[in-house]
Amino acid sequence: MQISSAFGALIWVVTSYILYAIISNFIISRRHAAKARELKCEEPPFEKNRWPLGIDNLLRALAADKAQQFPVDIIKRFEDLGAHTYRYQILGARNIRTADPKNIQTILANKFNDFDVGPSRRGNFLPMLGNGIFTADGDHWKHSRAIIRPQFTRDQVSDLNLEETHVQNLMKLIGPMIGSNGWIEQIDLLPYFFRLTIDSATEFLFGEPVNSQLRFLPGYQSSKLGSKEERFATAFDSGQMALATRSRFMDSWWLYDSLAFRNSCKIVHDFVDHFVQLALSRGLREKVSDTNSGGKEQYIFLEAIAAETQNPTELRSELLHVLLAGRDTTASHLGWVFHNLARDPVRYKKLRDIIIDEFGTYENPSEITFAKLKACKYLRYVNDESLRLYPVVPINARYANKDTTLPRGGGKDGNSPIFIPKGSSTDFSVHVMHRRKDIWGPDADEFKPERWEGRKVGWEYLPFNGGPRICIGQQFALIEASYVTVRLLQRFDRMESLDKDAVVGHNLTLINCIANGVKTRSSIEFDGQTSQNDDQLRTIVEKPLVQKRSRCPLPAEAKLPKSRKPIGTAS
């Protein structure tokens, strides 16, 4: 009887809440409609729901996520409505979604002060990442950006010695895979990209890498931190997956939580806090000096920002935000670049021929510099086209901090302004915008780097956001990706995709990563011939870049001067 009464009470509470939400939503909608008429705004198309409060919208989003088709489903929603801006409802909240360049420019620039990142992202990220540059608003955001921006100058990106060290670790890993015919018959490049970028990112941030690549080599001996390095990398990945699922619930992100997620957060915090305490006690430089010698003094991001603030929680938060940007965006972008190139042997050869001409062969390379990488047009086109088709942040959102408007999307023709009430969310999808055929042509879904020849773009192309919160580290991300691409194409004369699935999966955590992996078959070239000697091939593939001028990486056994690092998400 008690169980029956309790169940009845629960049903009554749930039913009452749903009725309250429906009535409240109706009253608010009427109030917003009156305000919209006052501002001479018209309604955009509305995505109809089958269930109350748009519960079916949440279920559809979760199903698309599970099927690894979330960005594809967003495109279909726009196509079904035949609009570039529409209103939708999810768990009672009525939001706007747009893929209109003019609206996105308004949100990110023209009316920047009308929109915040908002409480949803901040509340979602807080348990793991804290409140840093990607979640803060107002004065807190200005403070974070002021601390971080000076750390990403051209001096930091132009020295590529650190990157060569981690590229050589990659080459040591793939060396044993080379067969007697000079081919690596099967390799998934994606996990190698993630290991490379987390190693280089953590070395830049903390002064030493987590050595996620080296731990796979025979005879590797870990540092005093031991398994904590590996546990950190695993926890950082699993924690991001939880954050991504929470984000599907939007304002109700708190509905998704677990002990496993909280445990991941603790592991991540404990690892970073170790380095923060070293920096605050002035012990970080001494620790790094014990493991690195020779050359100029190593730049350490944590040490630099610790000179600006001594708040340990703030330091940890900013480190984790930059790590998210510096590791995941670059690795994901590299995955999409090689996904595209491996499926297009003609363009792979075209890019490789240009790289050999401008940067030399793997055995006889010329100098690879920041300036030369930026000046390599076709390499830039390949990066731009991959970011157009597969932007690392395919959808983003802002919250209105006051009643405001967007210039387009309302009325029958979609050209009237629309009303954005205070507290509502406006999503903007660059993934959809980057594939609009009315902007990019009928071949918008095709990988075609040549389309960038002579093309000037504005707000229709936003791989790194725009306005005051534009990504301050986009050059770092592009230079690192370009450097790794050059070295791999110098090494592999051919690359064939082994993924025959026409459906491309999207593993959308906080970053859009290819779910299929980058499974390829690749051949190693040596002086234009394929060697038949395994040992010779493995020696060649592990050969470090020794450049001809003063700023050259030293052989692998030497200690390298270090400085610089990637990053990638908009702040």
Swiss-Prot record:
Its cofactor is heme. Its EC number is 1.-.-.-. Pathway: Mycotoxin biosynthesis. Induction: Expression is increased upon exposure to hygromycin B. The chain crosses the membrane at residues 8-28. Heme binds at residue 471. It comes from the Eukaryota. Keywords: Heme, Iron, Membrane, Metal-binding, Monooxygenase, Oxidoreductase, Transmembrane, Transmembrane helix. Residues 552-571 are annotated as: Disordered. One of its GO terms (molecular function) is oxidoreductase activity, acting on paired donors, with incorporation or reduction of molecular oxygen, reduced flavin or flavoprotein as one donor, and incorporation of one atom of oxygen. It is a single-pass membrane protein. Its main location: membrane. It is found in: Membrane. Disruption phenotype: Impairs the ability to produce 1233A and its hydrolysis product 1233B. PROSITE patterns: CYTOCHROME_P450 (PS00086). One of its GO terms (cellular component) is membrane. Belongs to the cytochrome P450 family. Cytochrome P450 monooxygenase; part of the gene cluster that mediates the biosynthesis of 1233A, a natural compound known as an inhibitor of HMG-CoA synthase in the mevalonate pathway and with antibacterial and antifungal activities. The highly reducing polyketide synthase g433 is responsible for the 1233A backbone biosynthesis and the cytochrome P450 monooxygenase g430 catalyzes oxidation of the backbone. This is Cytochrome P450 monooxygenase g430. It comes from Fusarium sp.
